[in-house]
From Swiss-Prot:
GO terms for cellular component: cytosolic small ribosomal subunit. Part of the 30S ribosomal subunit. Forms a tight heterodimer with protein bS6. Pfam families: Ribosomal_S18. HAMAP family: Ribosomal_bS18. Gene3D superfamilies: Ribosomal protein S18 (4.10.640.10). This is Small ribosomal subunit protein bS18. Binds as a heterodimer with protein bS6 to the central domain of the 16S rRNA, where it helps stabilize the platform of the 30S subunit. One of its GO terms (biological process) is translation. Keywords: Ribonucleoprotein, Ribosomal protein, RNA-binding, rRNA-binding. Belongs to the bacterial ribosomal protein bS18 family. SUPFAM superfamilies: Ribosomal protein S18. One of its GO terms (molecular function) is structural constituent of ribosome. InterPro entries: Ribosomal_bS18, Ribosomal_bS18_sf.
Amino acid sequence: MAGPKRFNKDKRPKRNTQSLLFKRKRFCRFTAAGVEEIDYKDIDTLRDFVAENGKIIPARLTGTRAIFQRQINTAVKRARFLAMLPYSDQHRSL
């Protein structure tokens, strides 16, 4: 009967120290532009925050502040409901 396995520090994957040092600074484009509210009728802006498959891109990838991310979510959902934005771009052709 074997005893419990011990944790070996040498076998753990090494992190890239350079990527930790040169991290890109997060910046919210709405704060920089002085935008107070995001409008669902501004389709060109909303398309930047929707992926090719139709999903809303998360704030950790876009760098958007939480208050603006919530406004983006509601604006995209309203634009989809009014058929200004597609729910998905991957439609099958019959």
